[in-house]
UniProtKB/Swiss-Prot annotation:
Low complexity bias spans: 34-58, 291-307, 475-487
Lineage: Eukaryota, Fungi, Dikarya, Ascomycota, Saccharomycotina
Cellular compartment(s): Cytoplasm, Cytoskeleton, Actin patch
Main location: cytoplasm
Polar residues biased stretches: 11-28, 93-102, 190-228, 317-329, 541-552, 571-595
Region (Disordered): 1-676, 717-740, 798-822
GO cellular component, one term: actin cortical patch
Similarity comment text for this entry: Belongs to the AIM21 family.
Source species, domain of life: Eukaryota
Keyword tRNA-binding recorded: no
Chloroplast listed as a keyword: no
Protein name: Altered inheritance of mitochondria protein 21
Keyword entries, A-Z: Cytoplasm, Cytoskeleton
Skewed-composition ranges (Basic residues): 657-668
Length: 848
């Protein structure tokens, strides 16, 4: 339970803190930037590591009179901050759920100060606002706020975490708002909504220079050094204000990261520098305060635009406005910030060299713009800046009065037109960073002018193109009026176009602003602008020269067609003879390779292989000399005859020109379109020259059977052949070998004889082999038995006819041998038994 006891005072302190936060929501934002300018001078050398550390530093800075006491308090607070990591172990030691819940609640409060720490500061700002209502004097409000902060810090001593988070937020806020409350009383009325986001950014800016954004802690010391070199405190204060306004929300986010990363740095070292810088800041604030009342009225009326000149809707711009207003330091610095806020609405960040680019544009036009009280983007020109320095506060007051009138006229007009115009100016201004101190002071004065007339920039948008289009500065004033009248028919230059026209031209001004930006780089060319009219003159001259040249060329038309004809001929040669053209090109490209080809050619021509293509000697029938590729002839070896032949072929292929006769007459179509038909002298005829037929040889068995019958018919044949006489006797002697007739077959013989008589061809077959002497005896004996049956009745006749002689001439023997080969063996043997007769052989010879 001992842990729960200290938790009760923490809860009380947290409740008191929440009440303070509720009381101060919107005014807290301006209060912190007031205290921050003091830190900015001090904390430029150091960066706050965390939100808690930043709050502790602010609490230490409260008693500026006694820096040693503050250092002692800071040492105690630092120890408390170091004890913050002990927060997680507490719930570990306290096993009870209640203690853990209370600890988690306190942890939530501890983590909240990073986000809620911003609203806590506004609570102190409310106190500072009350002190502002009492007095705008030097630092009195800050002292009263410091006392209140000390009381709150004493209440938070019970717990380390609550002390660390609550104390730094309370004491730091009152000291700064005292200087800035004067400004914010005027500015906060217009921008009460964005307080929570704004205080967080100023905390980080405190580490940097008087800027709202802490991430520029490294960049801010450079900005501070610039005003110091210029040796004017007022200029330095104004410069500090502008860089504070310039840093964008991105810079603020970066500063948050840098604060966390820089937690390791010692706080004691930073506190000493902070105490000294705060004293310097107070002195500068006291000196700059008399200039505040002039700027307060302007800041309230003019909406601030985000940095970098981005265009936002009106409600967004009003919400983002307090971010820029929270940055003003004190006294004149706050006034300059308000001026910067009004100008940044369209201009974005105002860099030191932005005005240099426009100095060449409007040395002559600024006088008319001032008389017209126009808050155009051209008010930032060097001439307007110099005039502002000379005029002083009286000119500013006059401009403010004119601004109020113009605001009354243009209040109805949408204000994002101003953002469009001024955004172009910011882009123009971004380039130059030199002479930052002088430019800051001059630009701030110009911003005051613009604050007086925030919405009058719309009619001036068309004015930019006339300046660019104008050939000389002397004629720019006339050209501006003429261009305004041409671009937009109404010419209320003095009245600056009523709101109705502006509502109609809301879309239009964006278009002229873009060409204005593009034409800005041509400022250096303004001196050369008289040359621009000469250029169109030159173009006209060139066109006239071209016309003269065309006329000159048109005079001698006859030579032109000749040139064209020659070109056409060459072109047609390429079309009709691409091979020749390519060969000519190859000649030029391969001129260096000619000797090699000649060497190779000699080696192949002199060898036997060249006859067969140069590879190998083929077998007979493999090589066809007609198919062998022709050897490439080297260009150096070409004879003059070859060149002449090529030239002749080129001329032959060249199109022949038509003979020019009377142009009006044309040949009849029958003649012009005559078609030549060529017919060959040879007629083609087709027919069958020969044919082949294949047939099988048919052998009849009847012939074999008839052999036995042929033997039977020979008696009659013999009777018919009795006239032969003695020639057949020899054959009969040989046939005496037949003996022993056993079976008489007379009927068969008679029947067969009749058949044999009807078949004389069969007799031829039988009579062929009558005189074969080569037949072996065994074969004869085997067939004799078969023939005895048929020859029984004929034996006596055979015996009587033995006187017949054998017909054995050499020719007959040769014929018989040929016929014997074609006849079967059994037929031969049957013939042996028969009686040969010369008549039968004669018949055979006579047959076809």
């Amino acid at each position: 339970m001992p842990d729960s006891e200290p938790l009760e005072p923490l809860n009380q302190e947290s409740s008191s803190n929440t009440e303070q936060l509720k009381l101060s929501t919107t005014p807290n934002i301006p209060a912190r930037p007031q205290t921050r300018p003091q830190k900015q001078s001090t904390t430029t050398t150091t960066t706050v590591p965390t939100d808690q550390d930043s709050t502790t530093e602010t609490s230490l800075e409260k008693p500026l009179d006694n820096p040693q006491d503050e250092l002692d308090e800071l040492a105690h607070e630092i120890e408390k901050v170091l004890s913050d990591p002990v927060i997680p172990p507490r719930p570990q030691h306290g096993s009870s759920t209640k203690s853990s819940e209370t600890q988690t609640e306190h942890k939530e409060h501890d983590f909240e100060p990073a986000h809620p720490a911003i609203p806590q500061r506004p609570t102190n700002k409310k106190e500072t606002i009350q002190s502002e209502v009492g007095d705008h004097n030097n630092g009195l409000e800050s002292k009263s706020d410091l006392k209140v902060n000390k009381e709150t810090s004493d209440d938070s001593v019970s717990t380390d975490k609550d002390k660390v988070h609550i104390k730094p937020s309370i004491p730091t806020i009152p000291s700064r708002p005292q200087s800035r409350n004067l400004d914010f009383s005027e500015v906060d009325n217009t921008k009460p909504s964005t307080t929570p986001s704004i205080p967080a950014r100023p905390q980080r800016q405190s580490t940097t220079t008087q800027d709202e954004y802490k991430p520029q802690a490294s960049n801010t010391p450079d900005i501070v050094t610039r005003p110091q070199t210029k040796t004017e405190k007022s200029v330095s204060n104004e410069e500090l204000d502008k860089p504070g306004d310039e840093p964008s929300s991105k810079d603020q986010d970066n500063e948050r990261h840098t604060d966390d990363s820089n937690a390791s740095k010692s706080i004691l070292e930073t506190e000493k520098a902070v105490a000294q810088e705060e004293k310097k800041a107070k002195k500068s604030d006291v000196d700059n305060k008399p200039s505040e009342p002039t700027t307060s009225t302007d800041s309230s009326t003019e909406p601030t635009a985000p940095a970098r000149g981005f265009r936002l809707p009106l409600h967004m711009q009003q919400g983002s406005g307090p971010i820029s207003t929270s940055t003003p330091v004190a006294g004149s610095e706050a006034e300059l910030n308000s001026l910067n806020n009004s100008n940044t609405f369209g201009d974005g960040e105002v860099t030191p060299g932005n005005s240099d680019t426009k100095a060449t544009f409007k040395n002559d036009e600024d006088v008319e713009n001032e008389n017209r009280t126009d808050s155009s983007s051209f008010d930032d020109d060097m001439e307007t800046i110099s005039q502002d320095n000379e005029d002083g506060e009286q000119d500013r007051r006059n401009r403010q009065e004119t601004a109020t009138e113009e605001n009354a006229q243009e209040s109805e007009a949408p204000q994002f037109e101003t953002t469009i115009i001024e955004s172009g100016e910011t882009e123009e201004r971004d380039g130059d960073d030199t002479d930052s101190g002088e430019l800051y002071s001059e630009q701030q004065q110009n911003k005051e002018k613009e604050e007086t007339v925030p919405a009058t920039s719309t009619p001036k948008i068309p004015q930019r193109p006339p300046k660019k289009s104008s050939l000389s500065r002397a004629t720019t004033n006339d050209s501006l009026t003429s261009l305004n009248s041409t671009s937009k028919p109404p010419k209320p230059v003095i009245s600056k176009r009523p709101t109705t026209e502006e509502s109609l031209s809301n879309i239009e001004p964006t278009i002229p602003s873009r060409p204005a930006i593009n034409q800005i780089p041509s400022v250096g060319e303004s001196q050369h602008e008289p040359i621009v009219p000469n250029r169109p003159g030159n173009k006209d001259l060139a066109s006239s020269q071209k016309d003269t040249q065309v006329s000159v060329k048109s005079k001698p038309p006859p030579p032109k067609p000749k040139k064209l004809s020659s070109k056409i001929a060459a072109f047609q040669q390429q079309l009709f003879n691409p091979a020749n053209a390519s060969s000519e090109e190859d000649v030029s490209s391969t001129g260096s390779k000619q000797p090699e080809s000649g060497i190779r050619k000699r080696s192949t021509e002199n060898s036997v292989l060249s006859r067969f293509g140069g590879k190998a000697i083929p077998l007979p029938g493999m090589f066809n000399p007609n198919q062998m590729p022709k050897p490439s002839i080297s260009h150096g070896e070409e004879t003059s005859d070859d060149k002449e032949e090529k030239q002749e072929s080129a001329t032959a292929n060249a199109p022949v020109r038509r003979t020019r006769g009377p142009r009006g007459k044309k040949l009849p179509k029958a003649v012009a379109d005559a078609e030549v038909k060529t017919e060959s002298r040879f007629a083609i005829e087709s027919g069958k020259l020969w044919s082949i037929e294949f047939k099988k040889k048919i052998v009849e068995e009847k012939e074999i059977i008839s052999t036995s019958v042929e033997d039977l018919k020979k008696p009659k044949i013999l009777s018919e052949n009795d006239e032969a006489g003695d020639e057949s006797k020899e054959t009969a002697v040989e046939n005496e070998v037949i003996d022993n007739p056993e079976i008489p077959v007379k009927d068969e013989l008679q029947h067969d004889v009749v058949d044999v008589v009807g078949h004389p061809e069969k007799d031829v077959v039988t009579g062929l082999d009558d005189d074969d002497e080569d037949v072996p005896p065994e074969v004869n004996e085997r067939f004799i038995k078969d023939e005895e049956i048929s020859n029984v009745g004929v034996e006596r006749t055979i015996a009587s006819e033995t006187t017949t002689e054998k017909h054995s001439t050499d020719e007959e023997e040769v014929e018989e041998e040929a016929e014997v080969d074609s006849v079967d063996i059994p037929i031969r043997r049957v013939a042996v038994n028969t009686v040969d007769s010369t008549e039968v052989q004669k018949d055979v010879e006579d047959e076809p």
